[in-house]
Amino acid sequence: LGVFATSSVLGPIIGGLFAGASQILWINGWRWVFLINLPIGIVALFMVVSFLHVPHTPKQHRIDWLGAVTIVIAVVPLLLVAENGRDWGWDSTESIAMYVTGGVGIILFILAERAAKHEALLPLSLFKSKTFSMATILGVIVGVGMFGGMMTLPLLLQIVMGATPTEAGFMMLPMVAGMMTATIVSGQITSRTGKYKMFMVIGPSLLALGYLYLTSFSADTQYWQASIGMILIGLGLGQLMQTLTLAAQNSVPASEVGVATASATFFRQMGGTLGVAVFISILFNNLADTIPAAFKRADVQAGLKAALKDPKVLSDPNNAEFLKGLQSGNMGALAGKLNTDSSFLNHLDPRLARPFLVGFADAGVTVFAIAGAVVAVAIVIAIFTKAPALRTKSAVQEAAAANAH
């Protein structure tokens, strides 16, 4: 799980490298965001086949085809609305149709899993364990707060601090360092003491503290100041990710460890998808308020007045669209470009670009505040979640012992 958590943060770094490259092996750089999974997947499959040798007793099983179909009906519409809701409108006909279809799919999936019983894709008996249920809820909440808030950071680094995608990726390294450190330390303590409940509470507490710290982010924030918040977030995630899965794994019978692990990961990823969709929507929708408010700030107005008296600024064609919008009193079109392409800010006179930077930073602060509040809920739930004792035997060993009797 520490590997997964670290990979979640390394992803934007590597993705930034690909996005910033014009071509790699004669293929557009951004396409490697998808293509990189092919060689990695092939290596992973080779290692599994070569090194993972688990004793297997053939048994007759029935594949839960109905569960597989209904979970697709449930999940795909929700993913579509999460991806397109900001463009469609969250209350549009298309979005409502996706909500309804997804809701019907969830009901059908539950009915299918009840009928499949122990052969179910997701055995509902797992939720009889209060710990598993609480760990699942925690996973969803943490996924929302983790991915939703974390995906905002690279945008702020690029738009407000002027970093390229590649630079923004490397600027996330403090979070990676915090995560790896916390993962190693908490993992060692857990393996030596068998106790991990404290990390279920400390983890989200540090995560919330990191978001709380980042609510002080502004257009004047220095990178070293932002990196403190990243380290706190990394320290929180490094402790939390693996312990949530440990709680889920140790709350179910040994024979169900695999499906419990997969389920915990699935629900966390769904929470992350929801978090990214909602928080990015909040970020860009907030710009309609924060950018006009930034134009009214005294320091911004002073800079604008000085720039408008500068002949070089007035004659620069890069400033023409801004000046036209300012003259008409409608900056909406230019502000709207931040949704798709913020590169125009790099060519504007810094005094003209400042209200956009201030407004974007203020919108990001709103996201961090909401993400922190979401994670605070996780802290409360974690306090009341029971942490089962760690197993002393693997599932294979337990099965062998049961067969011996």
Whereabouts are the PLM-identified features?
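Membrane-embedded alpha-helical segments of multi-pass transporters/permeases
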Residues: 42-50, 107-111, 212-215, 281, ...
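Transmembrane-helix exit segments and adjacent C-terminal regions of multi-pass membrane proteins
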Residues: 43, 47, 53, 111, ...
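Symmetry-related core transmembrane helices of the 12-TM Major Facilitator Superfamily/SLC fold
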Residues: 32-48, 70-74, 97-105, 366-383
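Transmembrane core module of solute transporters
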Residues: 38-39, 66, 80, 88-259, ...
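Extracellular/lumenal inter-transmembrane loop segments of multi-pass membrane transporters
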Residues: 16-29, 85-89, 159, 191-192, ...
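Helix-loop-helix hairpins in multi-pass membrane proteins, especially solute transporters
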Residues: 1-67, 93, 177
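Hydrophobic/small/kink-forming positions within alpha-helical transmembrane segments
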Residues: 9, 13, 72, 180-181, ...
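Small-residue-rich alpha-helical segments with characteristic i,i+4
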Residues: 1-14, 20, 149, 155, ...
